[in-house]
Each structure stands twice: as structure tokens, then as C-alpha cells.
Amino acid sequence: MAAAGVVSGKIIYEQEGVYIHSSCGKANDQDSLISGILRVLEKDAEVIVDWRPLDDALDSSSILCAGKDSSSVVEWTQAPKERAHRGSDQQSSYEAEWDMVTTVSFKKKPHTNGDAPGHRNGKSKWSFLFSLADLKSVKQSKEGMGWSYLVFCLKDDVMLPALHFHQGDSKLLIESLEKYVVLCESPQDSRTLLVNCQNKSLSQSFENLLDEPAYGLIQKIKKDPYTATMVGFSKVTNYIFDSLRGSDPSTHQRPPSEMADFLSDAIPGLKINQQEEPGFEVITRIDLGERPVVQRREPVSLEEWNKSLDPEGRLVAVESMKQKIFRGGLSHSLRKQAWKFLLGYFPWDSTKEERTQLQKQKTDEYFRMKLQWKSVSEAQEKRNSRLRDYRSLIEKDVNRTDRTNKFYEGQDNPGLILLHDILMTYCMYDFDLGYVQGMSDLLSPLLYVMENEVDAFWCFASYMDQMHQNFEEQMQGMKTQLIQLSTLLRLLDSGFCSYLESQDSGYLYFCFRWLLIRFKREFSFLDILRLWEVMWTELPCKNFHLLLCCAILESEKQQIMAKHYGFNEILKHINELSMKIDVEDILCKAEAISLQMAQCKELPQAVCEILGLQDSEITTPDSDTDENVGSPCPVSAFPSSTLPILAASEAKDDSPTQTLASPNACRLTPA
């Protein structure tokens, strides 16, 4: 047989003593034990599971299998002294990959001259191998029933012979496979593991995105440094891709250089198109005018807050207080009280007595929900796979959330227990969403400030109302935000956008983590407290967090373009900004951008909608004519008398710099 298309591969798992129990005939109740060797082999983006009788596997340096047309041979080789250890933790090269496995049909062993394998060796007919991309499910044996075994079921419903692990270690194989695919328990059968279960897949995608060590792995596909800088996000984008791409085999293998474009094609609404097509809004050359220079103020103090309360404890001049919080934040002693208003737990116009009654009501409601999961017996939980999965994820995440913060450090920390209980109770509050990786990041600062389980829960529930779409399976919120961010950045600096597009970075995937958990991993813990409370004022405009993204990217533009960063370098650079961003500087820049846009009289409608700058009628106090009725004029969220603007000539040297929008034009595909 011609050995055309020979390629080498690496054994990443190997186990001897894996048997097939074949029946010898109806008259014999005994099984015939066929000893074999099981291997998992990796080559590029394809992972192969191979079992063959021990007689056929003696020469492990050359394993041959035919392709679909039997015209090519794939040779899996193992270099000397490269023999893999058992298990899945010995190879690092597969821990950071796109998980894009080429679909290959089940491959039978090649025959020669029409002879079946059984003509040469009766055991050989049991040999099999398959691509991991074809795996549908794995059936496990019951515990305590002798030798453990696994049964592989493929996507074409082919059921392979059961593999009995006489020497144990079947769990090591499962762990190895989980490096490449997501396995989760079937709702119908706890012994069956399904491949790529979407609920768990999404959570694990977020886990890889948010797991700091994953970002440090220097793992590559074809020595592509992309995977070294964005392994976590690659899994998230691949999750989106897998859920949308369908079964077209032609889409299952793409070179890394095409991946950004292909992912964007797979996600509806994430396409930037510079061709003229019906339904697109043209963002023409727009002069945004000079960018105002703004200054921050001191945080609102507890004394200042108390002076704003009437005798019944009702806050007066709410909008004025929000503006003060936006421009300066809150003193820490005030956060426990003010955050409840900012997050909607307490109504702004409520009295002290009304808030006391509300807290009593919410306390009862919270503990009723908490009792629901606390009262579930172990036997009941075994029959509730979703609750069991939620608990497992929460326990895993709680043990690694902000552990350097004194509030959460150490073993058996009360803060960790509260974090766990609040997240479990939230699963009862919103069982459809349950728990997804990243939620613990949103809760941690809230619990730290509130120091109270009930108050922290209701503040978290309110925050999740805002963030809910970020964690839904379809991730519509994330898609929309990426589109909107692209729209805003292009208006501000289309030249920079064009550069990013030329480097396959125009879809701003590197901002995914920023948006998903509102910069939680990008700033220090104390800076996040300040940043979040400013954003919760919902000033100076809608989607202010997108302008924060623009401000950060604008600050990094010079280095990215001057050093000619490519796709990989951009991703790496953005990732390494974590904990290095000045929160006050970025807040100043983002506010200045919002004011610059609000003062522009020719702002595109798409941008007005993103920022919530509604069109209004221009009228004059001394005129009752309708001459100017209908003229568009974006309106700032700030009253004109309170705009914290300085003329450029009055700016201090350390004030945010001013830039003007690039004049280039583009088209944006609507979401």
C-alpha cells in the first residue's frame, strides 16, 4: 500500500491491560478476553483514539490506518524517549488549543486484497480507531461492579465494543479526553457522559477565559503564538463557533490566520462591511470637535451624604448626588449604604422606615430560597444533575476567587462560606441561568462591601439583572456589546480600527473579558470598587463602560501601531494590561469622550442609540415658531450648567490629552 500523505503524531495517553470481552459462543458462558493497548494520539488539530490487540500493537513506533478512500496512510509515530506517561498531565502541548477538531469518519483498518483482518489474526477484527470529533458519548460502568469499563458511542450511532480496564485507570482516560472536549453527565443517565454539553461548555469556556494561569501557558498549534496569549478566549469563541457553525465539514479546519474572520462570519451581527449594501448606515466623515478636558472630584463623604437626607431619611436632589458620585465615587464608609441605592435594592425616594421594612421582607425571602437547596438530601441531589453541577462549579470557583484579599484568604474563611451560600441561593432565585463561571467575580466585591449575606445577595441579584445576557448560552449581550464597541471606536478613530482590521483584530475579541465581568480582572480590587460605583450611576450616558473600553484602547494605540503589533502581539499586549491601568485617568478620558460626542451635532443615529443620546427639538425661549422643530441635537445626560468641562487652554499638564476623530468612513452591519 502506498504510504502517501504520511504524517507523524504524538502519543499523549497510553494504557495496556485494556481488554475486550468477546463471547466465544452461545454454548459458552465464558468471555474470551482479548488484551489490547489503548492510545490517544494527537496530530495538529486532530485527536485519535486507538485500540488494538496487543499482538498488533507490539511495534508502537508505527501505527497505520487508512483514510476514507484508503488511498492515503496516516502514520502515527513516537520519537525515542518520548513515550508518554499514563494519564493526562504529562503533556502541556494540548492544554491550550482552539479545540477545533477535524471531523473524520470512523476509519476501519485497511484490508489487503480483499482479505478481512480475521483471515490474518482472529483478534485483529476487534481493532478500532476514531477521531475524537466523531465521539458522541461515553458510557461508564457502575461503581463497585468489578473491572471498570467504558463504551464509546459515535455520532453515527456506531457503538464500539466495551473496553475493560483490568488495571484500572479508566478515569485517567476521561481526564485526558476532557483536555480536548467537554464531557458532562446526561440528564437521562448519570453513567453516560455527553460530548459538548452546552450549559457546561459555556461555563468551562468562561472558566478558561477567566483563569489567570491559562493566560500564561505557552501552548501552540503549529507553533502559532496566538494560543499562548488568548487560550481562554479561544475556547469561548470556539464555543460560539461550535454552537452556530452547523455540520458543514468544510468549516471544520481553518488555518489560524483565517480564524478571526471565520468566527465573525459564524456570529451573526459581528460583521463590519465596507461595501455599500442596503440597510447599512454610513458613518461619514464627522468632525467631533475639540475634546473637553475634565477633572475628577473628591469622593462623596458620609457627612455629605447625610446632609442630603430629609428628616424621614429620604434622599433629596437625587440627580445631583448621582453626578457627585460619578465624578468622585464614594468614601468607603459610605459604600455599604449608597451601593444599595445605586444597584436598585433601595428605591431612591424611600424613607428610612420603608427601607427597614423592605430589608425584613427581603431577609425572609432570601432564607426561604436558601432553605430550598439546604434541605435537599444527598439522595435527592443524586437525581438532580443540574443542582449537582451548579454546586460543583461554585465550590470550585469560590476556592479561587480573590483569595489574596484578606476578606477571603485562608482556609475555612467565613467570607468563602458566605460567597458559596449566596451563589447557591442565586441558583434557586434564577434556576434557568443557575451558575456560570465569572459570577463569583461579580459577587465578591459586593459581599466585601456589604459584610452581610442578605444585603449582598439582593445587590448581586440586581447587578445580575444588568449582566444577565452576558452569561446566557446564546451570549447575545456579548455579541451586541462587541458590535457597539466597534461602532464607537470607528467613529473615534477609524484609522486605528483599520489598523486592527489589517491585523485580524477588528472584531475586538480581546475586549471580551473586559465586557464579560466589567473589568474585574483588569483593575485592582479597590479600583474596581471605584469603577463600578461610577458606572452604576448610569452617567453621563448609556453604555458608559464601552467608552471606558475606547479610552483604554486609545491609550494603547500609539504603542500598538508604533511597534507594528500583529494579531498575536495585540492580544498579548492587551492581556498584560491587567492591574496596570490607572482607573482615574481612564474615567477622565471616557467622560471626555462622552462629552465630545454629546456636543457633536452630526452624531450618527447608531451612535446616539448606543449612548442613549436622544434627538430633541431645538427651541428658543423667545420664539414660539416651529422653524427648528425636528432638528436633531444630541442631549448630554448632564445639565449644561453642571458639565465639568475645562477649556483645552486651561487644562493642566497632567489632564487627559485631546484627540480628534479620524475622517475615514465605514459601514456597520446592524445587529
UniProtKB/Swiss-Prot annotation:
Query: Phosphothreonine occurs at which residues?
Result: 669
Query: Which residue positions does the secretion signal occupy?
Result: none
The answer on whether this UniProt entry bears the keyword Hydrolase reads no
Listed GO molecular functions? GTPase activator activity
- Modified positions (Phosphoserine) in chain numbering: 23, 32, 70, 205, 257, 623, 655
Instruction: List the Pfam families.
Output: PH_RBD (PF12068), RabGAP-TBC (PF00566)
Residues that the record marks as modified (N-acetylalanine) are 2
Instruction: Tell me the compartments it is located in.
Output: Cytoplasm
UniProt keyword terms in alphabetical order: Acetylation, Cytoplasm, GTPase activation, Phosphoprotein
Tissues expressed in: Ubiquitous, with highest expression in heart, liver and testis and lower expression in brain, spleen, lung, kidney and skeletal muscle.
Principal location listed in the UniProt entry: cytoplasm
InterPro entries according to UniProt: Rab-GAP-TBC_dom, Rab-GAP_TBC_sf, SGSM1/2_RBD
Q: Give the multimer and partner information.
A: Interacts with non-phosphorylated form of RAB8A; phosphorylation of RAB8A at 'Thr-72' disrupts this interaction. Interacts with ARMC12.
- Spell out the protein name for this chain: TBC1 domain family member 15
Q: Which organism is it from?
A: Mus musculus (Mouse)
Q: What is the lineage of its organism?
A: Eukaryota, Metazoa, Chordata, Craniata, Vertebrata
Encoded by which gene?
Tbc1d15
